[in-house]
Amino acid sequence: IGIVEEEGRLPLKRGPKALQQNGMPFYHLTKKGLIVALAIDSISERRRILKGIVNEANDDEKQAFEIMAKLVKIAPHFAFSVFERYVKAYCENKLNDIVPFTVENVSKSADNSAQLQMELLEGFSKLSKSDRDQTIDFLKKID
């Protein structure tokens, strides 16, 4: 599925003769692999990975990755949950491929939770300042 690619081989001085002659392979993540990495909670370098992807993105993907980078700054749990849903949608065959990572493809991966979050965001933005503060206090208490 193209998540990793062989990057090269390191020669061995000891071990099986075949490995001494051919070397031990080492690998790197492809763009698909990096997107999958963004969906895994236990990876601590997700922000750095996203920054690297944004810098390398082509014109088709640049907008979606830049928006995601902004969301990671203000709402990291939400933003990384978008990557989780995106990879899950690919695993469930709702997407043909992980790349290109475009707004259109991300919208295909949206589920009920995305609609709930959008409804909350739109409603919250319409509240007065005092109502927003009360709502934030309430949500902090139930979190």
Model-derived segments and spans:
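A short, conserved structural fragment
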Residues: 1-14
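Charge-rich, acidic-biased intrinsically disordered regions
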Residues: 14-18, 60
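Short, amphipathic alpha-helical interaction segments positioned at domain boundaries
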Residues: 18-54
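Exposed, interaction-prone assembly regions rather than primary DNA-binding/catalytic cores
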Residues: 43-143
